[in-house]
Amino acid sequence: MGQIDGEALHWTRQPQAYKLAQDRIEITTEPGTDLWQRTYYHFRNDNAPLLQMQTDKHFFSFSVKTDFSGSHHRFDQCGVVMYLDSENWLKASVEYENEAYQHLGSVVTNLGYSDWATTRIPASVKTMWYRLSRRDDDYRIECSEDGQSWMQMRICHMAEGQGAVRFGIYACSPEDSSFTAVFSDLQMSECTWIAHDGQQPDEQPTP
């Protein structure tokens, strides 16, 4: 495993404007595109463009570098995604907020309800790496500003993530805006998320 062959990638939802090159992928977002299901906001948005590949491997890691220097409008975002269907997916990205800060966060959607976790980072950050790792039906999302030093963002379980899964990249602009997201260094590797070696599961009582 290593650099992902572009022929392995397929549009789950294709944008109007994009470029596929050997060393980079560009997606130009369209206004009013988003991914969210029900929680708090009570709307269901499911029209963001998605470029994904499929695997039945139960242990792997996928990493990608994102460049969102063209993003200047609230909620503009691009990042890593694992989209199984409209009710079951996860994503991680930086969402632009204003000239002072933006949101580095992840959304996990299980059985039709989205769960958002974020932290503020400076608006001056214009690139971010993400790494998605799978261990059976559990998943970890990490981020990095240099592609070398990684920080855990989230560990989660996917209710429908047991078999073959689709994963890749996405970009969207939920409000009235558009920008060009640039993706590079798409890599697939053996799982970098090692098995837990600390506290063991609770023992089940003997009947």
What does each of the following model-derived ranges do?
Residues M1-P207:
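Extracellular glycan-recognition regions
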